[in-house]
């Protein structure tokens, strides 16, 4: 299965290490098209924004499922979620409920599968369940 992993890049990299761990976990069984999101040394310096947009939207269309970590607010992740919804891609949103409140634009949209958590250890069994469910679909 091809997974589009979404996490904050320009909105803040405070959770980059978490993204990296989530991506590596998913990669044990599936393909993560956006593995660069978990790169702790990620830099978009020198990249042409239209190239980034075209690559990311191509990956979104190619993906089977979108998994987003939304604890750190990001305009880009919000756009990616809306884009995935447009193409009816299953979307799963994770966020640490002790650190943030999810935007009503996401939490109030019944298309999205919302997964609040308190501890990182809660994430991985949910990912297993998501990937198994989407694989069976």
Predicted regions and their residues:
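Conserved catalytic or regulatory cores that recognize and/or transform ribose-phosphate-containing ligands
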Residues: 1-137
């Amino acid at each position: 299965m091809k997974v589009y992993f979404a996490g904050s890049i320009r909105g803040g990299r405070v959770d980059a290490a978490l993204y990296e761990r989530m991506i590596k976990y998913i990669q044990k069984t599936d393909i993560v098209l956006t593995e660069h999101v978990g790169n702790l040394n990620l830099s978009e310096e020198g990249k042409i924004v239209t190239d980034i947009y075209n690559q990311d939207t191509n990956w979104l269309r190619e993906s089977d499922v979108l998994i987003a970590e939304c604890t750190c607010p990001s305009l880009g992740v919000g756009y990616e979620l809306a884009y995935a919804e447009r193409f009816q891609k299953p979307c799963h949103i994770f966020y640490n409920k002790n650190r943030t409140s999810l935007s009503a634009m996401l939490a109030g949209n019944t298309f999205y599968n919302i997964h609040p958590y308190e501890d990182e250890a809660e994430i991985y069994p949910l990912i297993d369940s998501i990937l198994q469910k989407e694989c069976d679909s």
